[in-house]
Each structure stands twice: as C-alpha cells, then as structure tokens.
Amino acid sequence: MNGKNISNKIIYWYDNNKRFLPWRKKLSKQNREYYTLVSEFMLQQTQVKTVIPYFIKFINKIPSITRLAKVKNETLMRHWQGLGYYSRARNLKKTAIKITKDYNGRLPCSVEELKELPGIGEYTSKAIMAIAFNKKIIPLDGNVERILKRVFYLRKEEEISKEYLNGKINFFGTSNRAR
C-alpha cells in the first residue's frame, strides 16, 4: 500500500468519524486565524474534550486578537482558569500584542514567522499553517507519529526520533484537509 492510499483511507475515516470542533467550523478568514491560534494554545498539553467548553467561553468573552492584546492580565487569567499551564495564556497574550503591533492584527503566514512568536514551536506553527491558512503541511503530533511508526514498522530508537519521523511524513503526500 502506498502513501496516497493510506492518506485516502485516513481522510475517508475522518469524514465519517470526525467530531465537532468549534474552532474548525466555517468562519471568516480573520476569525479562522484567531480561533486556530487560541485553540492551538489551549490544546498544548490538554485534551480536546477538556478544551472545548473553555474555548467557547473564552471566544465569547475575548472575541478577537485585538481585544486579546488589550485585555487585562487578571481578566485573561480568569477566563483561562481551570485549564492550567498559565504560561500558555501569558504567551498567547504576548503573541496577540506582537501580532497587533507588527502584523496589523493578522497572523503571519509562514512557519518561520510563527515560530518567532511567544509560545509557538514547530508543531503549533505547522498546525496553524494547515488549519488557518489551508496550507499543505502535516504537523507531526502523537496521532501522525503513531501511524508513521506502524506503516514503517519502526521500533529502533533512532527510527522514532522527531527528525526521522519528520523526514517520513511526506510519504502521505500533502493534503489541505486540515479543516
């Protein structure tokens, strides 16, 4: 079985089993960017089912990147309360301030520029590119890693390093099906 066949099977499975994620519904471009940014910060080290109700409340209280950049720290922490890892909230606000100041309130649209923002690393930058900008990029998360290990029968420590797996990720081809 080749990578394209596996990709098609995964997409078919997803189409039939996907769950509703409020940050992936049909949105304006600007809202899609903001919702993706907020959700990716919230999802760092936290399960989707935990994030959903916090995300909905957060977006209702702080509906835009410019509002987030201006929100008082106490208000931000109150809306983040219960999610833990409060450095994520602080970094999210720092990122909003920088985006408002340096990018006119719009997310930068390259992996390299995104990685320069506070709290955004390799995975988050690629996830934002795939979801918010519909780019043909596959971020390496635990699910993709698990599939790669199974497809390539990887067992050795050197075969399961992030660098090695990132080299294998294009086996699946590229798709803009992140949303």
Regions found by a protein language model. Give the residues of each.
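Catalytic cores of DNA base-excision repair glycosylases
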Residues: 4, 13-179
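Non-catalytic nucleic-acid substrate-recognition regions in nucleic-acid-modifying enzymes
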Residues: 10
